[in-house]
Amino acid sequence: MFLFPAIDLKDGACVRLKLGLMEESTVFNTDPGAQARDFAAAGAEWIHVVDLNGAFAGKPVNGAAVDSILKSVSVPVQLGGGIREMATIEDWLARGIRRVILGTVALKNPALVKEACQRFPGRVAVGIDAKGGKVAVEGWAETSDLTVLELARKFEDCGVAALIYTDIDRDGVLAGPNVAATAALADAISIPVIASGGVSSLVDLKALKAYPKLEGVISGRAIYDGRIDVAQAIALLKA
């Protein structure tokens, strides 16, 4: 199982949000490239990056910060936030992003996801963010009537590399991940699932590791708060 240390970008800096609220952000590092280097030095095999401004704007905003991350590390980077068009997907992959994460567009234009998977095999992930079990989009500002499983099943046979499942009600509050919902989703679909939201300790990582269908786990605030040591977490997940 992989650990995906998270870099959430707002106005060019590494921040963490609480419950997905932009006004509830805390700056942890003003140099995203340096943060990425720290993660790579600790043994991270992937880095998870989100363009928060982009998620709300519907187009990339923190391009310079993402480029600084790509220049700073050789480990693969997956990126989400504001990726809504094929031209944007092409651009990010050409710039060195290993895997793009499609969120809002997966709900609003699933055909684009399927086309991207055909054109870029293994380089397209779907991000499903849930609030009360229902899919949330537009930077979590809007909730749909679709359940997580209903949306996930739309992409079962089109070659999606991974499904990143975030429980917004737990994100950035260190309340522990929604292990039951995440495990149930992983059991119900054939796409590898990456858990996100609420991870607060090595105990939480152990709980998720018990489910072999999970490909990995994303952690942000717990790392920045010093509750999780990246090297220790990787050793635990690899053991």
Swiss-Prot record:
SUPFAM superfamilies: Ribulose-phoshate binding barrel (SSF51366). Pathway: Amino-acid biosynthesis; L-histidine biosynthesis; L-histidine from 5-phospho-alpha-D-ribose 1-diphosphate: step 4/9. GO terms for biological process: L-histidine biosynthetic process; L-tryptophan biosynthetic process. It comes from the Bacteria. Its main location: cytoplasm. InterPro entries: Aldolase_TIM (IPR013785), His_biosynth (IPR006062), HisA_bact_arch (IPR006063), Isoase_HisA-like (IPR044524), Isoase_HisA-like_bact (IPR023016), RibuloseP-bd_barrel (IPR011060). One of its GO terms (cellular component) is cytoplasm. It catalyses: 1-(5-phospho-beta-D-ribosyl)-5-[(5-phospho-beta-D-ribosylamino)methylideneamino]imidazole-4-carboxamide = 5-[(5-phospho-1-deoxy-D-ribulos-1-ylimino)methylamino]-1-(5-phospho-beta-D-ribosyl)imidazole-4-carboxamide. It is an enzyme of class 5 (isomerase). The keyword Amino-acid biosynthesis applies. The active site is at 8 (proton acceptor), 129 (proton donor). Its EC number is 5.3.1.16. Keywords: Amino-acid biosynthesis, Cytoplasm, Histidine biosynthesis, Isomerase. Signal peptide: none annotated. It holds the Pfam family His_biosynth. GO terms for molecular function: 1-(5-phosphoribosyl)-5-[(5-phosphoribosylamino)methylideneamino]imidazole-4-carboxamide isomerase activity. It is found in: Cytoplasm. NCBIfam families: 1-(5-phosphoribosyl)-5-[(5-phosphoribosylamino)methylideneamino]imidazole-4-carboxamide isomerase. Belongs to the HisA/HisF family. This is 1-(5-phosphoribosyl)-5-[(5-phosphoribosylamino)methylideneamino] imidazole-4-carboxamide isomerase. It comes from Paramagnetospirillum magneticum (strain ATCC 700264 / AMB-1) (Magnetospirillum magneticum). The gene is hisA.
